[in-house]
């Protein structure tokens, strides 16, 4: 994703927000990052994208490599110091910063206060828009019948459930239908799908079955890892359900191929 770290114009007086792009968005779906910037700027924020940002450290942390996770976390803390807020389009990454960073440094006097300060200023995108900025409208059109997938980290660690639905319900032309077991894991789980592929395939197959039962033509969600995993299974099974990050729809930027689809679609 193109760097946008230059200071915002002085004419803007809104909060200074740093976008935590996330590895997956940067590498596989930069449009989500651009959608996040648009949503934040439309809400009055001065958005910057620090070019030196790195991974949140979650893969290392979840794999038991505490030393590497702490080293990466220190880079993140240093990079995002000085902003009013840090916002990311992923419940998974932002839960790591909000919940795990304070735990990583609770016995480290040199970093404890900084880790807690960053955690308190960090938010998942949908939560930030609704809970902090008070956004309740979406002045865009998206024609489709969608169902929403709740990511485990966003739901269980950050309590994100109604926020994206509230925003999406305001989108003209969009119908939302809840799927059975919407809160059940899709089987991605970061490194989980690599360590336990057979279990992961069974879980995502069940998820696809639940999506099928809704009759929806579109799947929406707030974590690219989950969406890529589900989209991959949908395509392998020959399903035509479109897959988008909620930010793409809310920003009016879902006029491109869905996640997992050829760009020529």
Located regions from the model:
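Iron-sulfur cluster-binding electron-transfer modules in prokaryotic oxidoreductases
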Residues: 1-265
């Amino acid at each position: 994703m193109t760097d946008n770290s230059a200071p915002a114009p002085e004419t803007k007086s809104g909060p200074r927000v740093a976008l935590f792009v996330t590895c997956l968005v940067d590498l596989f779906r930069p449009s989500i990052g651009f959608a996040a910037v648009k949503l934040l700027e439309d809400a009055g924020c001065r958005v910057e994208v620090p070019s030196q940002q790195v991974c949140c450290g979650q893969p290392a942390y979840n794999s038991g490599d505490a030393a590497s996770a702490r080293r990466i976390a220190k880079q993140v803390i240093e990079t995002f110091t000085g902003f009013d807020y840090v916002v990311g389009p992923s419940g998974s990454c932002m839960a790591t910063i909000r919940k795990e960073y304070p735990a990583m440094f609770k016995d480290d006097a040199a970093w404890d206060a900084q880790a807690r300060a960053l955690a308190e200023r960090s938010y998942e995108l949908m939560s930030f828009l609704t809970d902090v900025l008070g956004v309740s409208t979406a002045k865009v059109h998206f024609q489709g019948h969608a169902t929403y997938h709740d990511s485990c980290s966003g739901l269980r660690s950050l309590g994100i459930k109604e926020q994206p639905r509230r925003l999406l319900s305001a989108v003209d032309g969009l119908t939302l239908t809840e799927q059975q077991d919407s809160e059940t894991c899709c089987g991605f789980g970061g490194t989980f799908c690599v360590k336990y592929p057979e279990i992961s395939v069974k879980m995502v197959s069940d998820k696809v079955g639940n999506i099928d039962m809704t009759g929806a033509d579109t799947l929406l969600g707030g974590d690219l890892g989950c969406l890529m995993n589900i989209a991959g299974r949908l395509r392998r099974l020959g399903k035509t359900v479109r897959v988008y990050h909620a930010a793409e729809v809310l920003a009016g930027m879902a006029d491109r191929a869905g996640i997992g689809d050829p760009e020529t679609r």
